Amino acid sequence: MSAEKSHLCPLFWQHHEEETVLREELQRMKENGIGGFIVEARPHPDYLEENWWKDLTILLDEAKKLDMEMWIFDDGDYPSGKANGLLVKKYPELTKRYMAVQSIDALGPAKSRSVLIDAWLRPEEELLCVLAGKRIDHKDRFDGDTLIDLSDYVKNGILYWDIPEGEWRIFVIKVTKNGGEEWTKDYLNPCDPEGTRAYLDLIYEEHYRHFKDEFGKTIKGFFTDEPRFGNCQGYDKNIGSDMVLPWSKTLLAELSEYGMGAMKRYLPALWFDCGEKTPDVRYAYMDTVSRRFQKYFVGQLGDWCRAHQVRLIGHVVEENGAHARLGYGSGHYFRSMDGMDTAGIDVVNNIYPGRTEGNFWTAFNNYDTTFNHWGVSKMASSSANLDAKKQGNSICEAFGAYGWSEGLKAMKWITDAMCVRGINHIVPHAFSPAKFPDPDCPPHFYARGQNPQFRAFHQWSAYTNRVCDRISGGKHIAPAAVLYHAEAEWGGKYRPFEEVVKLLMQNQIDCEVVWSDILTDREKSSMKDGMLQINSESFRVLVVPYAEYLPHGLTERLRELAEEGLPVIFLKDYPKRSYFGSEFIPRDGMLRCDEETLIPLLESLNIKDIIPLEKKEHLAYYHYRKGSIDRYFFVNEGLTDTISVQIRFHDNREACFYDPMSGELLKAEQRVFLSGEEEGREVKLLLRPYESIFVVFGENTEACVENRKMKETIGWNILGLPESGWSMESSSYDTYPAFKAVEEHTLCDLSAPDKMPDFSGTIRYRLHFDGAEAREAVLSLGEVYETAIVWLNGQKVGEAICPPYRFYLPEGSFLPGENEIVVEVINTLEKAHHENPFDRYWVQEPTGLLGPIEILWK
C-alpha cells in the first residue's frame, strides 16, 4: 500500500453483528489503506445498552491492534440531535419550539369588534403577541408603518378592537412545538443551550464514562451528522416562506438589539412583505438564529470535545443552497462549521461524472450542479483553509446512496471533483457488515466479501491517499476571494457565490470563499502589500456576487479594503443599501461589471496564478504549497475530450510531474519563458478523460522517470487485436474465484438481453496473437466496463479502475511470434442487485470488454 498517511475514514455501520464479522471488516479496511473508521448505529438494536458497549469494546480492541483511529457517530440515527429518543423522554421541555403565525382578515372602520384569540392556541402553545397591519392592494402585502401591537387589548383570550378604516390583517403569533419537520420533531432546540447540554449528557458523557481512558488516543472524537433547524422539510426554505420559525426564549430581546426598538411589532415581516423594513427584520432574525445555532448547538459540542481531548467532525445539510437557509439548513454554513475541528460536507448522490451544468434528478432531489459540483467542496475547503483552528483540514462524506451502479470509476471521478476543490479527507459511505445485500443506501465497499470490485479498491484508496496527502499540511494559493452570499440571500435579491466560483474555475482562476464574519474581524483579516490576508493566504481581488443588501459592518469593511488598495469587484450592480443603513455609495477601488466582462477585468488586473495558452473549460486545478514545494493538481473533468495545452507558471524552477495513480515522479516537457522581467516555466500538459496529474516545483527532478503517461503515440505502428476468437470465462461475485466457460467468443456487451443481463462479477478474456519486435509498446483496451486487470505472456501488466485503459508494456513483454493476453474485467453489482431506489436513476452501462483493443508500438 501507499506510504502516505491515510486520509480515509469510512462510516462503519453497526447492527450487532458477530465479533468475527466486525474484526474482519476492520482488517479489510486496514489492508486497503484505510486508517480510521466512524462507528455508526444503523440502527443498533441495543444502542447505549449492554450490547452496544460490547460491540464498541470489540471494535476498540481491533482498532488498537491495527493501529487505526476510531470515531463515534453521535446519535442512534441521523440527523444528530434526538439522543436516540432519550431527549424527548427525559427532557421534553428541551425539544424544539417554533414561532408560528395565524391570520385573521378584517375590514374597517368597525367599532367594538372582538376576535377569538385563544381558539387559535392548541394545548401547550403559548401566545406571544397579537399584531395588526394594513393590507396593500388587497394582497398579502402590508404597510409597515401601520403595524401595531394589540396584545394589551386581549382579555380572557379575546381581542377587543375598534378596527380602523381599510383592510387589515390580525396576526396571532404564538410559540408552539407543532408544525415543524415531522422526522425531527423530538430533537433538541438548536437555539437554546439547555437542550445541547442534555444531549451531551445523554450521548457524549455516556461514551466518555465507558471509554475515557481511550479518549485522545485510539478514540479521536465524535462525528455529528446533518444537525439542522428542522422547522420544516425542504432545501429551499428561505425566510419569508410559509412555515413555522425557530424560536428561543431570548429571541425577542436579541432582535431588539438591532436598532429598531421594540422589534416585536415587526414580526409579521418574517412571513409577509411589510415594506422597506422587511429586509432588515429578516436579516436580524436570520443573523440571530444562525449565531445561536453556531454558539449553542455545534459550538457547545465542539467545546465539550476539545475539553475532553478529542475533536468534533461532521457536516450540516448543504445541498441546493440549504446551507444558508432554514428547514434542512443551519442558516449559515461557516457559522455552523465554527465549532468543528474540520470543515465538513457530504457528497451523497449529488455529484455525478460529467454532470457540471444544469439540474438532474436523483432519489433525493432535483440537484443543482452549479452548487453541488462547483460550490459545495470549495465552501468546505475555504472554511478549512481560512479558519485557523481547522489547520487546513476538510472532510467529505462521499459515495453513499448512489446505488450499486457506482463503482470505482465513478468514485475516482467524484474524488477528483472534490480534491481539486481542496477536500483532503474522505469519509466513504459506507462499510456495512450486515447480511448481503444490505438495502440501506448502497454501495457498500466490502459487503461481506460480495462486492467484486473490492479486489481493486486498493487502487482507489492508494490514489486518494496520495492526492489528499499532497494537499494537506501546507497552504492553498489562490488569487481571488469570493464573498459568501448568505446574508444577502436573507433580505433581498442576490446571486449565489457558486456562480462566481464556476466562472473563475472554468477560466483557471482559483479562489476561496470568504464570509462576512471573518472579513469584519480585523484580527483575522488585514491588508498587506495591497493584498487581503486571511490566515496564511493572500488574495489579489475580492469578488462580490450581486447583493441587493449587505450587513452594515460588511459594507464598511469593503470600503476600507478598497481604500487600502484591494480591487473589490461587484457583479451586476452595487448593493442598494446596507441593512438598517443608508444608501450604498461606492469608493475608489470598487469596480462593477457583469459576468461577461468579469474574466477580462481580472486578466487586466494580472492576478492569474497560471496561464493556459488555450481556453480549456474542463481543466480544473488547485495550487498547494508545502514548505519549498509547490504542487498544482490538474484534473480533466470532461468525459470525452483529451486536454493538450501549454501552461505558464510564475516559477522558474525546473518542473516535474507527480502521478498519484502510480506514485511516480515523471519528467516534464517544458521550456523557460520570459515575460517582461519575469522568468517562468511553460509546461506541456496532456490529460485524457478521467486523468489527473500534479505539476511540481521544488522536487528533486533527478528522481524522475520517463513520462510514459503523456507519451504521444502518433506515427507508431498499430496492431489491432481481433474482436472475435477470444476464450471467455465468468466468475460471479458470489462464486469467485471459481470460473466457468462463457458461450461467447466475440467482444460485445455481455449485459445484452440474450447474453448475461443479470451478471455481476468478473469476466476473463484470453487471446493468442502474433506480436512483433518492439522497443516500446502501449496497450489500449478501448471501452471497458469497468475495472480491468491485464497480463501479457504471464506477466502482470497492470490494473485500471477508470479510463483511459492504457498500459505501458515493458520492453520484452511484447514479443515477436505468439503472445497471450489475459484481461479480467469486473463490473458493478447493479446488474445482479438493482432492487433499490437509487440504481434506477442511472443510465446503465454495458458489461465487459468492448474494445477496440490496440497495441501501439515502435
What residue spans do the PLM features occupy?
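Aromatic-lined ligand-binding clefts that engage carbohydrates, nucleic acids, or primary amines
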Residues: 647, 769-793, 800, 821-824
